Amino acid sequence: MREVKPGSIELDFVHADPLARPLPVPELGGSVDLKRVQIGRTETGRPWALRLLGGQFLAVGVQGAGKASVLWSLLRALAPALRSGLVRVYGIDPKGGMELGQAPELFHDGPVYSNGAAAVELLEKLAEETRARAARFRGILRGWTPNCGEPFLLLVLDELADIIAYQTDRKLKERAAAALQTITSQGRAPGVAVLGLVQDPRKEIIPFRNLFTTRIALRLDEAAQVDMVLGDGVRARGGGAHEIPESTPGVAWVKEDGRRDPVRARAFHVTDTNIIELVHYVTGTSATVHAFPELHAADGGEAA
């Protein structure tokens, strides 16, 4: 149900949930349009596409909600651009590499597996590059283009709160927050984007979440958290992320700046095999999986 105007509402009658089953990932290859990077499907059957060029992205959900589906669907969709060097990805995984460590080859110089000095230095490096690019583009380009001679930069942060909220060193925490705010507020034109993944949407955890132009609410614990992620009044306009069942990881409500109503969508289901395929595709390597030979007893003996 949506309020179209005062005194007028619009109703959708759904007879079956088109997002109830996992969505298999498309084949690797093809071209990439950074203005429409498909990572899944909406409940109306349309592609769920992120406008990576000019956007900043925040995905919030409880453990098991499917944040990894958003991450790996995006990286698979970007595979041709990663392979050609058009897009360069950096990563910080303070959980010791439990997520990004599945495919470290995809990340420039490898992911950082902590929330300490190395993570902060990477954030500050990208913040400086954001400012430097803006200076180089000034008077020449209005913004990043595929032909500008520099790669589009994507920074993946999993888990974001460990970097800007749970860091116990006050100076590192302040430096990390300052650098990240520079990237998210100034990265649009220079071609620098952030995908932040987090479980806790409270304002004290992410005080500058308004700088993320696309906010993705996967399964949440409480109704109040929906408006924390998507904005005031979005839950009343249908964005019931707190009602997403545990059986549908990857289902989310998505709110983009400039659009009044949220969209319900589901990210592709990316398996471990799909991630291995992605690494081989991007790095130009190949691998064949062979069945382990069966061992048979010989001359009446027993197999070891």
Predicted regions and their residues:
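P-loop NTPase catalytic phosphate-binding loop
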Residues: 3-10, 20-140, 150-230, 234-238, ...
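Periplasmic polypeptide-binding modules associated with outer-membrane biogenesis and secretion
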Residues: 143-144
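Conserved P-loop NTPase motor module
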Residues: 166, 210, 214-216, 246-304
